């Protein structure tokens, strides 16, 4: 059974939804437009989040100091880098924090291994104009040779999640648009998707 991340919480209601459904991780996005929140909102949301759920900060080419501050004040339990952060950046960040770091990769070609200082890779759908949250899946066969634990994102929802897990056995599945209706988190979709995953 994989771990579950519900990403892109924008409203207090979204926090209450994940508190009901009890995924393993809840994601706060600090970049982009559709699901972006500011640091103060993240602090407030973290205070409302169930203690059993770990918070993930999603950053795109942000200042390392900003990430360190959110880790030190315990707003963020895990760091997800979703931009063009290179190994030098990851190394400098890991020298300053003890939290796990996830590096996102937008998949275009077959991936066999990952030489990275990050603790996990996250595989998402490739797009030339956005860093994630596209709602589109990619060719999962491109990951069939990858053997390390990884996070799987990209168009996952209640209709395809069981197939994805059966095919790839990811460490964690990352859901965002797949648990939304008209651009906002949907409690029923979250509960149903978590239930499917917990039964695998």
Curated annotation (Swiss-Prot):
Gene Ontology molecular function: phosphoribosylanthranilate isomerase activity
Pfam families: PRAI (PF00697)
GO BP term, pick one: L-tryptophan biosynthetic process
Pathway: Amino-acid biosynthesis; L-tryptophan biosynthesis; L-tryptophan from chorismate: step 3/5
Stored Gene3D superfamilies: Aldolase class I (3.20.20.70)
Keyword Amino-acid biosynthesis included in the entry's annotation: yes
Keywords recorded for this protein, A-Z: Amino-acid biosynthesis, Aromatic amino acid biosynthesis, Isomerase, Tryptophan biosynthesis
Enzyme's top EC category: isomerase
Catalytic activity annotation: N-(5-phospho-beta-D-ribosyl)anthranilate = 1-(2-carboxyphenylamino)-1-deoxy-D-ribulose 5-phosphate
Protein name, as recorded: N-(5'-phosphoribosyl)anthranilate isomerase
Chain's gene name: trpF
